[in-house]
């Protein structure tokens, strides 16, 4: 009989914010701090919010203006309790604020330092390696790991909870950062224990929360849990579709999966809604997850496409946005060359700014389709199009020309642009591209000698371009991404130079 598996998921608490607090010799649990680049205006997304600041009703990934608004509301409430309704000072420490109602709530806005967070993450990973072999650890993100603890419990003569606590305490001692953990009989259950159950239990003196689930306790505790979006891999789209068919909980989905064929709710309904993905949804509804750590680490995804996206820090007009598209295309092609890939299909998506409809001077110029964004605001429908090339290539010239033609064809020149996404589809290894024999109808009027000469010249151009691309890549790898810049990268509004100094779209 196979040994019962035991998995542990560990999530570092408000990781970016905790790092910034420790670097200021402050307590991450009591310091009001938000990680955000306020130079991008108050509309910028916050990367992390400290636990004490979240206590004022601030979500984990708000816009900076939401933080400002929530703190302002909290201060208005506190002012009524202060003597003479006047603050005597301010503090960004929750302990001081709780002890003295006459203090105004303050907070620190820390600019992101992605490279530094990666260093911290590496340091924490080395702590896990003191207890667990690398083949039994799967880094899920910069601040979260899965651990297969099955073969370590007897070795250390510990329970899963004791092992998890030992590692978390070591991380706390080494870095000053605390964590939340989930323990389960499969990878799904340990993730759910961490994400949902642990959030509803009291932390210990160090802020540590640890929760456990097996298949039966999962069903008892979470079959009636709402909303569905709290569960791993259930997004708003899935939840909306399920609720439209009367399925509001994991228990509803589980019951639906065992319905008879002549009943309204049965397995076929789920497969009709979600196709093959219904199999995973049904497994998760029952608390099953057949995928093991070994299978996860052995999985190698096929590279069929690469995508590059950018949200502009302010609305760009037609020409300035075109410059950004050109920069992004140029960088994407270099990435293809670096990976030895070629493509024959490019997809461009342009998202317009809300100012197109909120500004009276622009609103009446637009007569096209209007959609509602995720914040409930009206915005012109995005532009979307595809460019197909005659052959697979990684030529900057050919791909850029195709994308520029596509941009001119699909984008409304009167609208302001806010989001740009470029995708290269149908990627294959350039070494695997076989030259297929080409057949053509001969005639007496074509100068085939001139045609062959033209083809030879084109091949020579492509070869020269390829040597230049490889030289640029070599220099950039040795001296940094900004070691070689093009003239367009220095034009007003260009973003490539700044983005080369970022990690994940944020300051390095």
Predicted segments, located by residue:
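Short aromatic/hydrophobic contact patches that present stacked aromatics
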Residues: 146, 388, 421
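C-terminal hydrophobic structural anchor segments
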Residues: 405, 409-474
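Short, charged/polar surface micro-motifs in flexible loops or helix N-caps
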Residues: 13-15, 39-43, 353-357, 427-431
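DNA-contacting surface of Y-family translesion DNA polymerases
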Residues: 9, 230, 236-417, 437-439
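Hydrophobic, well-ordered secondary-structure elements that form the walls
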Residues: 348, 422, 480
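Gly/Gly-Pro- and Ser/Thr-rich, intrinsically disordered tail segments characteristic of DNA damage-repair
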Residues: 1-293, 444, 449-508
């Amino acid at each position: 009989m196979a040994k019962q598996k035991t998995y542990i998921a560990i999530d570092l608490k408000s990781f970016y914010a905790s790092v910034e607090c420790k670097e200021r010799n402050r307590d991450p649990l009591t310091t009001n701090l938000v990680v955000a680049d306020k130079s991008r205006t108050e509309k910028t997304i916050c990367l992390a919010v400290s636990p004490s600041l979240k206590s004022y009703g601030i979500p984990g990934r708000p816009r900076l203006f939401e933080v400002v608004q929530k703190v302002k509301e909290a201060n208005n409430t506190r002012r009524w309790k202060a003597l003479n309704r006047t603050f005597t000072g301010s503090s960004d420490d929750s302990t001081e604020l709780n002890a003295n109602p006459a203090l105004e709530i303050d907070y620190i806005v820390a600019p992101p330092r992605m490279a530094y967070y990666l260093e911290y993450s590496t340091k924490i990973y080395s702590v896990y390696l003191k207890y667990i072999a690398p083949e039994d650890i799967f880094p899920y993100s910069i601040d979260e790991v899965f651990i297969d603890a099955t073969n370590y419990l007897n070795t250390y003569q510990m329970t899963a909870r004791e092992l998890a606590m030992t590692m978390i305490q070591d991380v706390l001692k080494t870095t000053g950062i605390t964590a939340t953990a989930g323990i389960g009989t499969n990878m799904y259950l340990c993730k759910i224990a961490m994400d949902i159950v642990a959030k509803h239990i009291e932390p210990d003196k160090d802020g540590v929360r640890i929760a456990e689930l097996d298949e039966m306790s999962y069903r008892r505790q979470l079959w009636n849990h709402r909303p569905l979006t709290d569960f791993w891999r259930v997004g708003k789209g899935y939840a909306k579709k399920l609720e439209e068919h009367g399925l509001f909980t994991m228990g509803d989905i589980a019951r639906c999966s065992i319905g008879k064929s002549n009943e309204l709710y049965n397995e076929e309904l789920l497969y009709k809604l979600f196709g093959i993905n219904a199999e995973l949804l049904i497994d998760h509804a029952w608390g099953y997850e057949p995928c093991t750590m070994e299978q996860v680490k052995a999985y190698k995804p096929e590279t069929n496409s690469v995508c590059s996206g950018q949200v502009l820090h302010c609305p760009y007009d037609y020409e300035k946005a075109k410059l950004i598209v050109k920069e992004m295309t140029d960088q994407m092609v270099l990435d293809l060359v670096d990976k030895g890939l070629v493509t024959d299909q490019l997809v461009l998506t342009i998202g317009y700014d809300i100012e197109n409809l909120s500004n009276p001077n622009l609103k009446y110029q637009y007569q096209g389709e209007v959609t509602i964004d995720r914040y409930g605001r009206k915005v012109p429908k995005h532009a979307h199009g595809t460019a197909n090339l005659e052959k697979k290539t990684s030529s900057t010239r050919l791909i850029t020309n195709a994308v520029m033609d596509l941009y001119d064809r699909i984008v409304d020149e009167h609208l302001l642009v806010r989001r740009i996404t470029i995708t290269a589809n149908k990627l294959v290894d350039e070494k695997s591209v076989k030259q297929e024999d080409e057949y053509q109808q001969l005639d007496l009027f074509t100068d085939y000698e001139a045609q062959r000469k033209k083809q030879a010249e084109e091949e020579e151009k492509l070869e020269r371009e390829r040597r230049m691309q490889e030289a640029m890549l070599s220099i950039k790898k040795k001296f940094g991404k900004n070691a070689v810049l093009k003239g367009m990268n220095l034009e007003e509004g260009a973003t490539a130079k700044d983005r080369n100094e970022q990690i994940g779209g944020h300051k390095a």
